[in-house]
Amino acid sequence: VQMADGRLAETPLRGALWQALEVDSPQALKALVVQPHFGAAGFARLAPLVDQRAQMGDPHAAAVLQRSGEALAGMVHTVAGQLDLAAPAVCAVGGAVLHLGGLRDCFERALMQRCPGARLQRPAGDACAGALHLAAQTPLRC
């Protein structure tokens, strides 16, 4: 959208994104992204394309991944601070962090800067398994 309205310079990334979204003008892009059905999922489906372009050396795509990694690390930093966790183990369960190497690498680098000692780890199970594990550790109250 920033390229469409002139806030950012035109780049090959814009063309790739517009092709993926099947739009051919700034007006079509703006109309698409405000549709109720587009939402966060509409932007999220572009993540693999941005990750791929970044790994091909596109500096604009790399900047998007860097900002995204920093934003994720900032959220971890805030939560860890509120919970007084010095070096938390972080289980990223969203598809983008699990499946997009460029994003995961940016997140991990930013995490090391914002939360020294924190580490990414694969979850041992899903949310239900975690809830059952916590329930098993909690004494029964009658």
Please state what every model-predicted region is.
Residues Q2-C142:
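ATP-binding/phosphotransfer module of carbohydrate and carboxylate kinases, centering on a glycine-rich
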